[in-house]
């Protein structure tokens, strides 16, 4: 069966708002400029929407060789290729990650906007963060995504969920990279190796969801949905699944 790509997204800075794009350069580590940056605290620990839902109100845009971040009335810019020389060692969950700070001015801006000290850091080289996938029994070169380089969701999966919810939600809750048009809910779970254009992809594993999907990206208000409803029909092995993680071969 042929599937149509409906939407493409990148999330340049981990846990900040995403960008809808018409096209994207696919790489082994994920789409170009997708989750290549992240915020860390004074102990070099990852900062996410799980603890700071207000991160959803920071909106990045890539304009030529610059990244522009808007947060309400405040705007900050930095060069995409900009970074300091000194390496910083952090973690993305259980994975050691070698990153570098973008610049001091950008870190100060984020610290001021968030109200606590933090740094914006960037992963530079392939191999600076590796993820050991027990599911695939292999080590993956990944950017700063949670575990896998791409997230695929079928349109009917969201349509089915919205039929069960009192208030409909958008696909942005689930932060996919690729949204395809489907006719059967969650049929993407059962893909093996498949092709989009000239690119071959492999299904890695269904995506287990956390409380972050309960954060409304338009308002930064956290509720019990949609995780509460999803848990009634998408739970397996104590995880709630929505969408599937994929690799570009």
What is the role of each PLM region?
Residues 1-249:
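Metal-cofactor-dependent catalytic cores
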């Amino acid at each position: 069966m042929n599937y149509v790509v409906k939407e493409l997204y990148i999330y340049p800075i981990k846990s900040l708002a995403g960008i809808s794009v018409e096209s994207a350069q696919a790489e082994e580590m994920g789409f170009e400029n997708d989750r290549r940056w992240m915020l860390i605290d004074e102990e070099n620990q990852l900062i996410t929407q799980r603890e700071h839902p207000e991160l959803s109100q920071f909106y990045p845009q890539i304009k030529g060789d610059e990244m522009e971040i808007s947060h309400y009335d405040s705007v900050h810019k930095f060069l995409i290729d900009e970074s300091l020389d000194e390496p910083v060692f952090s973690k993305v969950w259980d994975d050691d990650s070698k990153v570098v700070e973008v610049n001091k001015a950008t870190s100060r801006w984020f610290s001021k906007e968030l109200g606590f000290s933090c740094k914006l850091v960037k992963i530079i080289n392939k191999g600076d963060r590796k993820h050991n996938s027990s599911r695939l029994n292999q080590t993956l070169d990944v950017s700063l995504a949670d575990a896998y380089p791409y997230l695929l969701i079928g349109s009917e999966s969201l349509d089915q969920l919205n039929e069960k919810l009192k208030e409909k939600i958008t696909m942005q809750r689930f932060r996919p990279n690729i949204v395809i048009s489907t006719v059967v809910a969650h049929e993407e779970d059962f893909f093996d190796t498949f092709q989009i254009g000239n690119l071959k992809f492999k299904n890695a594993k269904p995506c287990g969801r956390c409380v972050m999907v309960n954060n409304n990206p338009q308002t930064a208000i956290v509720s019990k949905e949609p995780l509460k409803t999803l848990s009634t029909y998408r739970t397996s092995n104590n995880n709630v699944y929505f969408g599937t993680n994929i690799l570009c071969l």
